[in-house]
Amino acid sequence: MIAFQAENLIENGTKRLFNFIFTSHLQMMDENGNMTKTEISTHKLEQCNISHFNEFDEASTYNVVIYYNHQKLLKDQLNDYYCLPLNYSLQIQGTQKSNIFQYGKISVTICSSDDCYSTDEIQQFQRLGYFNNSFKINTLMLNRVPNLNIPNNYISYIYSDYYIQAKIGQEIKTDVYLEQQQLSIEKSVIPGIKVLEQDHVFSIMENKLQASSVFTSNITRVASFFIRLSQSETHYYKEYYRFDELFSYVGGITQFLATILGYFILRYNQTGLQIKLANSLYQFDMPEKQKGQMVFSFQLLVNKIFESLKSIEDAVQKFKNSAHRIINLTRLAGGLKFINQQSYQNDDIDDEIVNHLATQQVPQTDKLKVEKCADHCHESNQTFYLQQDKKKFLSLIVQLILESRKKLSFGVHFLAKQVSGSFKKNTAVNYQSQLFEKSRKMILRDMDILVIMNKLQEIEKIKHVIFNKTQRKVFNYLQKPVVCVKKKINQDKYDQSLIHGDLKNKRDDTLRLTMSSKSLLGIRQKYNTEKKFNKLYEAYEELALAEDPNETEKIMNQRLLKLVEPTIQYSFNSLVEIEKLSRQLRYNKKKRVETQVLKPHNFKLGSSNEVEEEIENNFDIESITLNGQKKDNLYKKSQPSLPENKIKNLTTLQSSTRQLKDVQLNQIQSKQDFLDVEIISS
């Protein structure tokens, strides 16, 4: 819809000056190129009212101010505008060079009807100079614009205006193009079923509104507006998403999101798998903050192991001293018994001495027998408790080793540190991240499947050819390489009485990040468990205490024992020493039983030096340090010799000028102490 209005040049005029006439033209061209123009119809534009702009009442009008104030617009402006007659259908087609060209023309002329100024009045106005000034010819357009985003009505309206500057004596010509807007709407959402709705509207192309002026001698012609069809068309197509397209769209979005999320999930799983694999393959020297200082876990483990070894050595020393006391008591009781037997066999001994010895020795001998039996029982109990202590120390050492196995943790805290560390600089050192990077590189280097399979096949063959079943148990134990933050771990100085030079050298070798072929052996699903450590100790003990006459086997056993991790090696050596003591106690007990059975009744007690030598030979307990070496006179305690205790044989008693008056055996209440023997002579 379009309306026109011209400014009134006559001030305080009471009549109309201009008239608006619409003329429909038809231009036809025949086959010979002859052109004929025909004026089909002519209509005067009538004064506009609300009926001509009924679209103002619709909510789809863009100009909200005009929509809510249409009454004010009609009252103030529509009375001065002229519109086409109601219910008039405008027909346009073709172009200037087409066979049929139909268009409309709105002419603005000086009117000459009864309600207009007369010819004389117009000439007078011209003489007065009213027509020398220019004036405006305004248009009021309610343009139709397709909008497919509106759910119900797809046509929207835009209120706009266009004006031209006109002057009497010049004719202004303007082309108003109407462009066809084709609308096609597919409303079906089911695949294979089409429900197509089509419509079309004409919209005024405001970008093509251009005016041109032509001088004319006929002052009655002021302006002309040619309404014609535009050569261009605009097609609008809308369709709803069908179910198959919706599924495809959702699937595409899901696949895109899955690709992005899958990348992060893949990296997350890869990192988690690498950390899990690193925890299974390696042990980590994890730093811990204690009392404001950074302490590494391997250093703490060594300190705890050495503290445990001190208690083991104390127990070993205690059992050695107890064993020495038992042997001394046994030998002393035997010596007194043989003195009693010899005294009764000699007829030259004074009857008083014999009676005195008989009365004194009988209760003393019985008392010694009871004490000897009690001490033998105590010795058996010591052997039992020795085995129990060995098991307790083994369990303690295994628990210390298992608890010291630090692992890399993988979770939200680890990821947050990784992300924050990549964006920030000069932050605190992330030791766990450094350990993970080093272990990841080691995994990539060591996990070549071809190399692993070849080495496994080769080593399995060699292992079954060289070793027996027990040796394979020790050989199968694998120590994990230590992943360190620094290239070398700062080693503190430990107690020199516990650490020897070979321990330090072996520990340095272990801390180096070297991967030998043996690190690829064995089953790693359950690498270190308490049960496996117990089996390892049993095999270690069997090889350490084996008395193989074959020198090759002996050297092989020693080499295998040296391959064990230093902390485990020195812990097991202390337990092996306890086992040696236990075996020695059982051997001495068995030997005493055989000696008592095979010893003749006329056995004479030898000199004190012979008795001492026999004691040392029967109970030859080697004092062994943690590294398997003997300690010279570390635990050896000089025993009081028999001459110092005034114990003499029969010949000595007979040749003595002094007579034996009394023999007293004073026993300390504790069974672990020596028996003090005091011989009182006159």
UniProtKB/Swiss-Prot annotation:
Q: Which GO terms describe its biological process?
A: reciprocal meiotic recombination
Q: Where does the record place it? A: Membrane
Q: Name one GO cellular component term.
A: nucleus
Which UniProt keyword terms apply here?
Glycoprotein, Membrane, Transmembrane, Transmembrane helix
Membrane-spanning segments: 246-266
Where mainly located? Answer: membrane
Q: How does it sit in the membrane?
A: Single-pass membrane protein
The answer on whether this UniProt entry bears the keyword Zinc reads no
Q: Which residues are glycosylated?
A: 12, 34, 49, 87, 132, 218, 269, 328, 381, 468, 550, 649
The name of this protein is Uncharacterized 80 kDa protein
The scientific name of the source species is: Paramecium primaurelia
